[in-house]
Design a protein with these regions (language model features):
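Short beta-strands and strand-coil junctions in structured, solvent-facing domains, enriched
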Residues: 12-17, 34-37, 51-54, 174-176, ...
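Extracytoplasmic
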Residues: 3, 22-26, 40-42, 269
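Non-catalytic regulatory/gating segments with a bias toward low-complexity or hydrophobic composition
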Residues: 6-7, 27-29
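Short acidic/polar hinge/loop motifs at secondary-structure boundaries
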Residues: 1-11
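Residues embedded in well-ordered regular secondary structure
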Residues: 35-178, 215-218, 254-261, 275-277
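Extracellular/periplasmic, surface-exposed regions of secreted and cell-surface proteins
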Residues: 184, 190-209, 219, 244-301, ...
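Flexible glycine-rich, low-complexity coil/linker segments exposed to the extracellular/periplasmic environment
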Residues: 69-137, 228-254, 372-385, 483-510, ...
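Short, glycine-/polar-rich solvent-exposed loops and beta-turns at beta-strand/coil boundaries
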Residues: 1, 18-23, 180-183, 217-220, ...
Length: 617
């Protein structure tokens, strides 16, 4: 509810000023702020019930127990096997005196064969006689009706020299899978102050706390045999596969044992700025933004016994990740006019961005008590291990932009960026990315009442992509004690066979000092229009996008030995296509706003070149 407007920039000329992080386009979100007037309090509450609804077309058709037994018998007959013996491996008796009937076609005799199905052990599918033959819909067994609540309160106020908005929100979402939920508490403060005629300051910060219990047992629910019950006969022990069945986990047990494995996630996001206007039309802005996240989880693995599937050791895996990302940008913007019809907007700027990630994990096993408050490493009696890493990257940019507007009839823009990234090799760390656009609002030359706005636009631009590992251009080496005596990096110089040995290193990646920016060059031609008092609107857009020096990490043949893995610049790709959007908006007499829109697009792509190292490989 804090979002006031959203804008999507897809063509290279519009997105180029944002640099490499705009390689796939830009979404601009404008958050709400205080508006001049009296103090205002907004309260919003929504609630939803959610459930899994299926139609005959959308639902995956799963076999019930009768269909499962029929398919099993038919498969055995098709392979020339004895269906009775075959089914016994799965806890089924096809020659039972009572149960449900099935029929299968015997290709050897060209006749149907009838069977009566029940559990192999007097109605039970396991020899312990704890799991009776069932007809379980596992998707239904793990599902429930979800329930979500959202509460939002916002207080805003503004004067001639200041604006302020404070909002707080709470969300509670119980998922459609049992024992899953998501809770979120957020707060945002957005203020601005005019200190004097020259200086103004402002900030916009949001802090969010999320608590999430998530699990993904759907694959097991879809593949688990319907003949297996949810619980054993005691009603509390989770059932599981038997005999020749695959070792699928009971999906409801997965959900139940995962209920305490919640991920705690804090997120601080925002920026603070200062504007200085020493001269008319001239503005200097310094903006510092931070994006900080920290997450923690203590993932418990409980002991359980589900017939042939079991776990006898209680385990925990602790994980904590801190991600700090800050951006400091400084811009100088000058707006001026010539002859009242020529309008110019000149922008010069620089920006530095730094990301740092610290990751830590600890593993321990062997607990006398399986409780979320007890299962911490200090209480473990078995194996313990830990791991951790720190990584990040830096990005520096210099950019300039000139916008020209002739009487709102002719529009032109030119942008140039010079970006440098620590992710690339020392020989090609920096890249230049220009862009230009031209717009012609020809509706001003046509005296048509039904035509409110029509603009033809052309654009061309280059953007860079640095979406690779932070250590992509380095040669990497690691120690590894976990391998056997032959392949381990430890040196057993005296052939002891055990103990602590001095260690060497093995290569895991070959460096590449010539690794460079992936570049996208895009051409666009389009038409934007609004008709009939702006009620009918739309766009027509055609584009060609050429991607050169694609960043790839290809597979390598084994004869290259250790460290054959290497990042490189690979093939070139061409995308081309068209996009159409059409919308209709109207405000009804009752004050209700109506906005209906849709889009249609098509595209093609083609690999236009391959590097010599890849040709014929």
């Amino acid at each position: 509810n804090d979002i006031e407007s959203m804008q999507v920039l897809k063509d290279a000329a519009s997105a180029s000023i944002y640099g490499s992080r705009a390689a796939n386009g830009v979404i601009i979100l404008t958050t709400k702020h205080g508006k001049k007037g009296d103090k205002k309090v907004d309260v919003d509450f929504t609630t939803n019930l959610t459930a899994q609804f299926y139609t005959s077309q959308s639902k995956m058709k799963l076999l019930d127990s009768k269909g499962y037994a029929t398919a099993m018998a038919q498969a055995a007959l098709n392979d020339g096997l004895d269906p009775v013996a075959y089914a016994s491996n799965y806890g089924l008796n096809l020659n039972a005196t009572e149960g449900f009937g099935i029929r299968a076609w015997n290709p050897a005799t060209s006749q149907y064969v009838d069977y009566t199905v029940n559990g192999l052990y007097d109605g039970y599918i396991n020899s312990k006689r704890t799991m009776r033959l069932s007809d379980t819909d596992w998707v239904d067994a793990i599902s429930r009706t979800g329930f979500s609540q959202n509460y939002n309160v916002a207080v805003s106020h503004a004067t001639d020299k200041s604006t302020a908005l404070f909002s707080i929100g709470y969300k509670d979402n119980k998922g459609i899978l049992k024992y899953t939920n998501f809770q979120s508490l957020s707060a945002r403060l957005n203020t601005s102050f005019i200190i004097n005629k020259v200086v103004s300051v402002g900030e916009n910060f949001t802090v969010t706390y999320n608590k999430q219990v998530d699990c993904a047992p759907m694959e097991n629910a879809l593949k688990m045999s319907p003949t297996v019950p949810v619980y054993e006969e005691d009603g509390t022990t989770f059932a599981g596969p038997v005999g020749g069945m695959s070792d699928r986990q009971n999906p409801l047990r997965e959900l139940y044992h995962n209920k305490d494995n919640h991920l705690d996630y804090w997120h601080l996001f925002g920026n603070a700025y200062v504007d200085i206007k020493p001269l008319k039309g001239l503005t200097f802005r310094s903006n510092f933004g931070v994006d900080y996240t920290t997450s923690f989880i203590n993932a418990l693995t409980h002991t359980f016994h589900s017939d042939i599937v079991n776990n006898n050791i209680a385990k925990t895996t602790l994980g904590q990740t801190n991600n700090t990302n800050y951006t400091w940008s400084n811009t100088l913007n000058y707006l001026f006019d010539l002859s009242k019809v020529h309008h110019f907007n000149v922008l010069l700027g620089s920006e530095i961005n730094k990301q740092s990630v610290v990751d830590f994990q600890a593993y321990s096993e062997g607990y006398a008590l399986e409780d979320v408050n007890y299962m911490w490493p200090n209480a473990a009696t078995g194996t313990m291990s830990n791991s951790g890493a720190k990584f990040g990257y830096r990005l520096a940019s210099f950019f300039g932009k000139i916008d020209y507007n002739y009487n709102d009839l002719l529009l032109a823009s030119f942008t140039l960026r010079h970006d440098g990234s620590s992710r690339f090799g020392k020989n090609h760390r920096w890249g230049n990315f220009p862009a230009a656009s031209l717009g012609f609002r020809f509706s001003q030359l046509l005296d048509k009442k039904w035509l409110n706005d029509a603009k033809l636009r052309l654009s061309w631009g280059k953007t860079g992509n640095q979406g690779i590992d932070n250590n992509a251009h380095f040669g990497l080496y690691v120690t590894d004690y976990g391998l056997d005596r032959v392949t381990s990096t430890a040196y057993d110089l005296y052939l002891q066979g055990s103990g602590t040995f001095p260690s060497g290193y093995r290569a895991t990646q070959t460096g590449n000092d010539n690794l460079k920016w992936e570049t996208t060059t895009q051409y666009n031609i389009g038409l934007d229009y609004s008709l009939f008092n702006y009620s009918l609107y739309g766009t027509i857009d055609a584009y060609i996008k050429n991607i050169d020096d694609m960043l790839i990490n290809p597979a390598y043949i084994a004869v290259m030995g250790e460290g054959g893995n290497q990042w490189s610049n690979g093939p070139s790709l061409r995308d081309w296509g068209m996009e159409f959007t059409l919308g209709y908006r109207k405000t009804l007499e009752c004050g209700l706003g109506l906005d209906i829109n849709g889009n249609l697009d098509f595209y093609r792509n083609k690999v236009t070149s391959l590097p010599s190292s890849a040709t014929g490989s």
